[in-house]
Amino acid sequence: MKCVTEEKCTPPHYRGYFEKYTENILYRNYPITYISWQEAENYCEIHQGTLPTESQWMAAAGITFGIRYPWGDEEPNFALANYDGFYQGLTPAGWLPQGASPYGVLDMAGNVREWTLDPYSSDDNMGGDTDRILKGGSSSDYPQTLEITAFQWHSEKSAGFNRGFRCVYTADSVGTK
């Protein structure tokens, strides 16, 4: 990974029984996980992008269409999203095209929670690590987390099997890739 070789990110953090899939070519189309917020942001910066804000993420998921989920208002099922442990792990990017947003953006619900640029603020966070908002739910989360307006938060220093990211780009930066 370019991010690791340029020393902007540390190698993925593996815990327990999860396979070191980033080292296996069979998993090259899977989301990057076990990555902290800062490492995700560094990765995006190396590729001339940034993490999306929560508003940008919701726009890509289709919030302006007045829908509950990226694919519409139909209740989640396992043809639309990877959630609730059904697939017993992660699925490759684009595995469930029926769950695409109105803009054709894939994997906006389920598989991995996605870091956003936005910090989470609560009265309970008394000077500890900065918490960051994650969107989309994960392969181990309940269906309610798949709603476009739902969110979760974790310490920006944390990394886990259910946390990943996507980068956003300006029109100018796309031509430079």
Please state what every model-predicted region is.
Residues 1-12, 47-48:
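Short capping motifs at secondary-structure boundaries
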Residues 161-176:
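Short, structured beta-strand segments at or near domain termini in extracellular proteins/domains
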